[in-house]
Amino acid sequence: MNILIIQGGSNHDLPSGEDTVILSDWENLTKEHNVNIEYIENPKGALKKIFGLVWSFDNYARLNFFLDKYSPDVVHFHTVTPYLSLSVLYAAKKSGARVVQTLHNGRWICIEGGFFRDGMYCDRCIGGCGVYGVIKSCKYNKTVSFCFFMVNFVARKSMMLFNFVDKFIAVSEFVRDAHVRSGFPASKVVVINNSVGVNLKKDKD
């Protein structure tokens, strides 16, 4: 099976936790499948970021290039929101491949992403529309928070997100429950915990 893994580029130099999970998955999958990883960089410049939140034509073209290059049977996305946009999910679905996204956090339902506000756990937007995050400026300020809120709201309420993705992988029962309570189809969300590297080699006395 040909599998294409897509990760949204980050703005930091050090690998993130998601990057570590992706490499671990790649090592496991390559034992039985042909797997390729591609990174799509976040857009540069405020205007490109804002106008590409809902639908990025640049990222749509980039993903189509990778689809033509690898002809995958499965496209597995990791970070999609906010900057890759629904356009990449649509491109993958349109190609005929099965589309999977790993839910590492709550970015589709919590504009902060990690269910935190003011340094404390917050679940006010779980099961709701997410407007509380705008009121509290959970992402930088009210303007940015509103933009992120609208992306998530449109993606879920229009059903585009659920129509474009065949299966969501939640990294924990908590993440799955939060998304199902927020409108994700329960039948589409499965739990696969992150793998943990364990060294079983005993030290010699």
Name the predicted role of every residue range.
Residues 8, 103-106, 113, 127, ...:
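Histidine-centered beta-alpha loop that forms part of the nucleotide-sugar donor binding/catalytic region
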Residues 100-101, 163-173:
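A short beta-strand/loop micro-motif in the catalytic core of glycosyltransferases
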Residues 1-43, 68-70, 88, 95-98:
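N-terminal subdomain of nucleotide-sugar transferases
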Residues 1, 199-205:
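Nucleotide-sugar donor-binding and catalytic loop/hinge architecture
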Residues 61, 65, 94, 107-110, ...:
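Membrane-proximal helix-turn-helix segments that form the acceptor-binding/catalytic region
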Residues 39-64, 77-79, 136-150:
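A short, charged, and often flexible helix/loop element on the N-terminal side
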Residues 174, 195:
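Carbohydrate-associated surface elements
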Residues 5, 66-84, 97-107:
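Short N-terminal targeting/anchoring amphipathic segment
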